[in-house]
């Protein structure tokens, strides 16, 4: 079985990428340098191929402990088959990274240079500087926002042999898909989204005005408002009825930089994540009077992580409309992964424009829970494919036979194909854009899953 090792200096995102590729939270991720000192290993599947993924300790010469970690890491790299060398895209290349990269390149193994934390246009421009490493394979990633990982997975996939073990293709999903195919839309779960309470988490860093926004939304002083950062530790729940729908608002604890989180706030952060697991929509509150920060981006990533409907709320807004357009442009550049989220400006303390959030929440929730008729969905897909045919895979035709919605909140669509591995991420993005052109999908993510039609049949034939 092929071994793939993730290598790099401390705090470049190795453990986050390990968790992303392993699709489970095995490694501890933190902003503290050197969190991973021992190697973590997991057997993983890259689609239908299995391999051993290794998360190594950080390469660092700063003290005796880290020197030992570095020696262990280099020994692991010698025994690995594929090396993924990671650097921090927020910084310019330096000689230490180059030295480590060249040392690993001399092992004569397939090696990729991964520039992580590329979250904006500015980061993309800076990433060009890493071409001076002379790496044959370079990938720009934002692991925290799950951007660019598909290309890296494709590269790894081509380097590992086909597995003799069948990957877990999720029997529940296959059975569910069979049910949809047999019974059409009637086979989908019957949740009464038109009457259930809408759960809304209010998220943001400390002191951006989340509690003021909650008070303005429910029209009473339920949450303590203070200039002292971090006044809200326990989540604050409040309900409000609008057009016969119950909105359940939760003002979550403000989130600080990880290095500043103390014990009680760590618990509050854990509670915030638990709340978001149960939520339908997140209101991401940003302070319009301050520049956007990396922490804002990380918190925004929580909305994407939990696949929530999302509205970006610019609080403390006292600028004119021309300024709004400028701020929106900057936001869209920084938060590319939230391109679907509507943006609204408010002044929570003064109650300005807060009332516009109620209909917007209803609109986003409707989009988030909508059912797409299979016939209409396939008309849209067929038109998209006619306009821009699916690129071939090494001369072989790639086909989408049909699409079917298999989940809601958010909409989840299976693309039944002959070669799901061959659907390039850029074409997937093209299909998503076409769906957004033809459906009301503002405020909601849409999940597309390529699925092999013969996968289940071939498994049954082998038994």
From Swiss-Prot:
The keyword Transferase belongs to this UniProt entry's keyword annotation: no
GO molecular function per UniProt: GTP binding; ribosome binding
Domain KH-like residues, every copy: 370-454
UniProt KW keywords: GTP-binding, Nucleotide-binding, Repeat, Ribosome biogenesis
Binding site for GTP 1: 8-15, 55-59, 116-119
Keyword Heme attributed: no
Residues covered by the EngA-type G domain: 2-164, 198-369
InterPro entries, per the entry: G_ENGA, GTP-bd, GTPase_Der, KH_dom-like, KH_dom-like_a/b, P-loop_NTPase, Small_GTP-bd
BP GO terms, sorted: ribosome biogenesis
Binding-site list for GTP 2: 204-211, 251-255, 315-318
Signal peptide: none
Subunit structure, interactors included: Associates with the 50S ribosomal subunit.
Its job: GTPase that plays an essential role in the late steps of ribosome biogenesis.
Record-stated family: Belongs to the TRAFAC class TrmE-Era-EngA-EngB-Septin-like GTPase superfamily. EngA (Der) GTPase family.
PANTHER family cross-referenced by the UniProt entry: GTPASE DER
Protein name as catalogued: GTPase Der
Organism encoding this protein: Campylobacter fetus subsp. fetus (strain 82-40)
């Amino acid at each position: 079985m092929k071994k793939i090792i993730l290598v790099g200096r401390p705090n470049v995102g190795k453990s986050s990428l390990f968790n992303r590729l392993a699709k489970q939270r095995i490694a501890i991720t933190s902003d503290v340098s050197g969190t991973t000192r021992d190697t973590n290993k997991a057997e993983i599947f890259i689609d239908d191929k299995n391999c051993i993924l290794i998360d190594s300790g950080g390469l660092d010469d700063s003290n005796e402990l880290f020197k030992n970690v570095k020696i262990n890491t280099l020994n692991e790299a010698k025994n690995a088959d594929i090396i993924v060398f990671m650097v921090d895209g927020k910084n310019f290349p330096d000689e230490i990274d180059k030295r480590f990269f060249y040392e690993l390149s001399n092992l004569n193994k397939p090696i990729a240079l991964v520039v992580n934390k590329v979250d904006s246009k500015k980061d993309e421009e800076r990433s060009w500087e890493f071409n001076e490493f002379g790496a044959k394979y370079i990938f720009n990633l934002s692991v925290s926002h799950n951007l660019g990982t598909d290309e890296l997975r494709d590269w790894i996939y081509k380097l590992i042999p086909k597995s003799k073990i069948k990957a877990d293709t999720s029997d529940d999903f296959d059975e569910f898909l069979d049910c949809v195919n047999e019974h059409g839309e009637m086979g989908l779960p019957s949740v009464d989204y038109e009457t259930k309470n809408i759960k809304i988490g209010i998220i943001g860093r400390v002191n951006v005005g989340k509690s003021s926004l909650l008070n303005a939304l429910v029209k009473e002083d339920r949450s303590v408002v203070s200039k002292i950062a971090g006044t809200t530790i326990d989540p604050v729940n409040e309900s409000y009825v609008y057009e016969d729908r119950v909105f359940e608002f939760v003002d979550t604890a403000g989130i600080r930089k990880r290095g500043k989180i103390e014990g009680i706030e760590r618990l509050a952060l854990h509670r915030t994540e638990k709340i978001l697991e149960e939520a339908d929509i997140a209101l991401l509150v940003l302070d319009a009077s301050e520049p956007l920060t990396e922490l804002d981006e990380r918190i925004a990533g929580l909305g994407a992580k939990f696949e929530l409907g999302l509205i970006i709320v610019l609080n403390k807004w006292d600028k004119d409309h021309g300024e709004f357009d400028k701020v929106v442009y900057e936001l869209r550049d920084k938060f590319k992964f939230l391109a679907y989220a509507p943006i609204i400006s408010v002044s929570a303390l003064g109650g300005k424009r807060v009332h516009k959030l109620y209909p917007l929440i209803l609109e986003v929730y409707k989009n988030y829970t909508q059912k797409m008729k299979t016939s209409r969905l396939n008309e849209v897909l067929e038109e998209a494919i006619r306009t821009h045919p699916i690129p071939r895979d090494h001369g072989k035709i790639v086909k989408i036979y049909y699409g079917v919605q298999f989940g809601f909140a958010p909409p989840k669509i299976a693309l039944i194909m002959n070669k799901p591995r061959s659907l390039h991420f850029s074409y997937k993005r093209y299909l998503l854009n076409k769906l957004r052109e033809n459906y009301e999908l503002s405020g909601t993510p849409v999940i597309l899953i390529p699925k092999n039609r013969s996968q289940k049949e071939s498994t049954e034939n082998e038994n």
